[in-house]
Amino acid sequence: MELQFPLFSIFFVTILFFFLFKKSSKTTKNLPPGPRKLPIIGNILELAGEVQHRVLAELSQKHGPIMHLQLAEISAIVVSSSKVAKEVLKTHDLAFSDRAQLQLSKIILKGCKDVVFNDYDDYWRQMRKICTVELLTANKVNSFRAIREDEAWNLVESIKTSLDSPVNLTHKFTSLTNAITCRAAIGERSKYQDELVHLIELMAALGGGFDIADLFPSYKFLHFLSGLRSKLEKVRKRLDDIFYNILKEHEEKRAKTKNSDGRVAGEEDLVDVLLRVQEKGGLQFPISSNNIQGIICDMLTAGTDTASTALDWAMSELVRYPSVLHKAQAEVREAFKGKTKIHEDDVQGLSYLKLVIKETLRLHPPAPLLLPKECREQCVIEGYTIPVRTKLIVNAWAIGRDPEYWVNAESFDPERFSNKSIDYNGTNLNYIPFGAGRRSCPGIAFGIATIELPLALLLYHFNWGMPGGIKPSALDMNEVLGATLKRKTNLLLSATSYTPNEDSS
């Protein structure tokens, strides 16, 4: 989650209530270095804007790979190197295993009874195990392949009907990943899909940063200033209504079709799986409807934004680097030659395509600052004392572009991953697009599967370029940091249909 701040509220609080705040005389000695703090608001103004990951990377060049920030009442450390990341994500992983609690999670997720935002405790361990053993296993991810293939083909067909004008790939990718994730989570083309997606997007937009309540948690009377709480409560009320109906429909279907082991006829969606686990019982913490709602919200938020953003950046980089685009297309077109229908199995041998995706996620990690954690026990990192409740921000974006490890770090060069055993699981701390340690993303396989086939089909079926004769190097690559790191402007590209005989002419 990024650090976006409502400046009008901050200035209002600063001016109107200045006399209420006194600088505490209780300061923790031996904190990491950092930029000078202003009274009351600390370093908030330095993080104003849309590219906090870049600002923090620049500050780290001056203050070091571990840096202290004061965000109003919140004490935070920022880690910007793989060496220090190993300390906080591996060596002292347990000490930083709690999640920073934000107003979003407290309201929308009803006290954080999900997996993403819940603190590290017995309940979290139970629910994480359910996610890894029941919801996101390789077999379960593979069971949704028909959905991914169907929606990827729908993407191709929708582009074929709009070749007369530039194709808005940003919108296409959002529709694609919304459809895949919703069908996998709540069932085949649910009538609630469109509104549910809208609410998830609204939730992500509203909760895209620290609110006054997050910055000044001790001063409850200030929390009304931004109006965020009432907006979040309205979203939660509508989510409650929708999930009540979704769960009711699933329970009715299960009552009619489930077999002796509790499984419904046909392929289970994620709600079916959670209801089956709920009915089976035997858990230390029985699963409630609220728990199911929280976990499905996690899946919808992560599953839609992460994959669509990665596809957007992948096509952006490919168009900017024509030689890479041509090589990726040559591999795909050779592999798919003569095939009338392309399946996920056909993608598994596309080694260069996989390198393209890895390189895309190096330069454009979905959550460049990962999700903020919280220190649960005092520890010493690089000789500095980190107090309990200090927030931890890991700048995965800066680590992925560290010139001390990555040669020509700013260039898009998929072949840098050739013959290197670097995976997505955070085993190499120089490459952590999905985090590392016990709080890393459990849905990596689902996300990568959602990216690979659509990207391969776009490279096979179409020739791509910039509209209006614009040079590829002129493509706007500006970013905006919301729930994920997105393009600031939609990606509009020109496309022409590819026919296999082009290669022989």
From Swiss-Prot:
Cofactor: heme
Cellular component, GO annotation: membrane
Location relative to the cell: Membrane
Class of this enzyme: oxidoreductase
Cross-referenced InterPro entries: CYP450_71D, Cyt_P450, Cyt_P450_CS, Cyt_P450_E_grp-I, Cyt_P450_sf
Transmembrane segments: 1-21, 442-462
Keyword terms of this UniProt record: Heme, Iron, Membrane, Metal-binding, Monooxygenase, Oxidoreductase, Transmembrane, Transmembrane helix
Gene3D superfamilies noted in UniProt: Cytochrome P450 (1.10.630.10)
EC number: 1.14.-.-
Binding site for heme: C441
Membrane topology, as annotated: Multi-pass membrane protein
MF-aspect GO terms: heme binding; iron ion binding; monooxygenase activity; oxidoreductase activity, acting on paired donors, with incorporation or reduction of molecular oxygen
Functional description taken from the UniProt entry: Probable heme-thiolate monooxygenase.
Membership in a protein family: Belongs to the cytochrome P450 family.
Listed name of the protein: Cytochrome P450 CYP71D313
